[in-house]
C-alpha cells in the first residue's frame, strides 16, 4: 500500500459532493466517506496553496462534519513545518460515520511527512476534482523521520 492521503470522488447532486478519504502513512491508516458542499474543495485548495510560506506557517482544513449530528464522516488536516530545514508534517484525523445507533465512531489520527512539491500537486488535483467531479486528489507521503 502506498503512503498517501487520497480524496476520491463518489457521488454528487446539486448541493453536496460525496468523497472517500483514505490515508496510510506506513504504520497507521483509515478511510471514511464524507459529504461536502459544492465548491468546498476549491476553497480548501486555496487555504493549502503556497504552503509553507515560512517556518511558522500553519494551515488547517476540515472536510465533512465531526460528531453524531451530521451524516457521513469527516477529516481534519493540519499542516506545519517541524524544523529550520523546512520539513513539513501533516496531522490527519479521519472519523467514520456514526451510523444509526452507534454511540462512538471509529477514528484514526496519524502523523505524515510530505514534500511541499507534493502538496502543490495535491492542491492542483483538488481544484481539478472540484471542477470535474471525477477522479482523485492524492498527496504522496514520505516515510516518517524519527
Predicted features, each with a name:
Residues 23-25, 65, 94-100:
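Short acidic, glycine-rich loop/turn motifs
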Residues 41-48, 90, 119-129:
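Short, structured motif recognition centered on aromatic/hydrophobic residues
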Residues 3, 17-21, 30, 57-59, ...:
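One face of beta-strands
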Residues 11-18, 74-102:
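Intrinsic, low-complexity N-terminal interaction/targeting segments
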Residues 96-146:
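Mixed-charge, glycine-accented linear interaction segment located at domain edges/termini
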Residues 21-23, 34, 79, 92, ...:
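Preference for bulky hydrophobic residues occupying beta-strand positions
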Residues 29-72:
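Short, well-structured hydrophobic secondary-structure segments
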Residues 1-25, 30, 34-46, 129, ...:
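Charged, alpha-helix-forming regions
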Amino acid at each position: 500500500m502506498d503512503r498517501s492521503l487520497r480524496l476520491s470522488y463518489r457521488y454528487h447532486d446539486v448541493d453536496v459532493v460525496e468523497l472517500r478519504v483514505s490515508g496510510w502513512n506506513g504504520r497507521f491508516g483509515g478511510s471514511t466517506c464524507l459529504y461536502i458542499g459544492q465548491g468546498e474543495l476549491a476553497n480548501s485548495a486555496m487555504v493549502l496553496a503556497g504552503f509553507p510560506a515560512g517556518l511558522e506557517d500553519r494551515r488547517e482544513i476540515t472536510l465533512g462534519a465531526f460528531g453524531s449530528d451530521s451524516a457521513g464522516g469527516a477529516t481534519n488536516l493540519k499542516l506545519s513545518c517541524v524544523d529550520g530545514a523546512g520539513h513539513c508534517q501533516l496531522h490527519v484525523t479521519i472519523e467514520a460515520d456514526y451510523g444509526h445507533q452507534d454511540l462512538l465512531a471509529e477514528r484514526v489520527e496519524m502523523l505524515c511527512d510530505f514534500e511541499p512539491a507534493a502538496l502543490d500537486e495535491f492542491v492542483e488535483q483538488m481544484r481539478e476534482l472540484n471542477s470535474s467531479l471525477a477522479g482523485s486528489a492524492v498527496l504522496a507521503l514520505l516515510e516518517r523521520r524519527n
